[in-house]
């Protein structure tokens, strides 16, 4: 049954919420209230009602009326933003941060991760449950991935921009119901979703109506959309394969499991000899090597750092990178190599907390199953201007020249802009979006850190962070 938009709006305000108080991991804002809720979302065609939900991790005082809603990027989960959010609400106590958990995160089975976080299973048991079993002959209980046939049956091939935007509309409606200001932000592909939402046609009203600001964290929408032929070809190809994106060439759910297990082991068993390194299927590019190119034994922390740090992380994982320090260093004789975080922008342990959901129950910062349809659809947003590809894909991001002139925009880039050239330029995308609607230049803040920040440094850098130093006054000035 399809729910009307008015029904969805009412559901957003009086949402079917399952509130779970989540333990706040230590740090500068450990007193911040953190809770997760699931709301009834958009009734997507072909999707069972149990999956027509959208999650939110809410950080900050329940008395705060202003809300920054943040949409994750490709293969990102809501917990990724929690360390940043705790810091923000400590600096701007009149605000809450709501980190979106897209519907596909309902497919994850986090029970064993929760046990590991509570110390109820060993590191070896935890790793074996999610990955190690793949090379072991015994039949002990282990993680069972969602089958391609089941995902297809549940409509996952249709979880594109329309589904993401309609689910987000529920979240925005709930945030507006608090009576304060609402700002929508997004990281990476989440920035494309921000543009799509702001310019979307909701029964004649554009999504930006009632929003005070937009925040683009190294992401946005190119003004040059895909062609109709390209959109048709992408849909045809998707119809014959898994609904899930193989991000960086690594199929689902393996990339998400690599991220989750690697970060959790780095966080909870950092000095132990690497479990992943002893697992035969681990790709060579994720195995620590010395400067001469020889593989070296390393700790869990060092193995995780090697895979995400600029300088050792491979180009196909640029979207996972941070500046986490100098890298792996040799320890004593017979000891595994360890991590040297000297000079880090994003401390490696902080990044491990972001990706593993440290101290939180039932969530992590990685998305194990990410629908490829959302990436296909993102190419047609075209900064919110009508184009033939949108018609092919069923998108309504058409009000790109009609945004309120009162809207404020903040955008920050990273080294990805230099890697991908003019085809990917966060600041130009944001500036162009503002110019289309004659938003005054004084309302637009552009932060250029492409010479120093990796893709995840804006969200992870601590205690010095160019993004935070601009975001806090941006929010408080609205």
How would you describe each model-predicted region?
Residues 117-176:
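Alpha/beta-hydrolase active-site loop
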Residues 101, 294-478:
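C-terminal subdomain of alpha/beta-hydrolase-fold enzymes, centered on the catalytic histidine
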Residues 185-190, 194:
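Gly/Ala-rich beta-loop-alpha elbow adjacent to hydrolase catalytic centers
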Residues 207-212, 218-353:
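Alpha/beta-hydrolase-fold enzymes
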Residues 60-132:
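Short, surface-exposed "cap/lid" segments of acyl-processing enzymes
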Residues 12-23:
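Bacterial N-terminal signal peptides
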Residues 32-61:
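N-terminal cap/lid segment of alpha/beta-hydrolase-fold proteins
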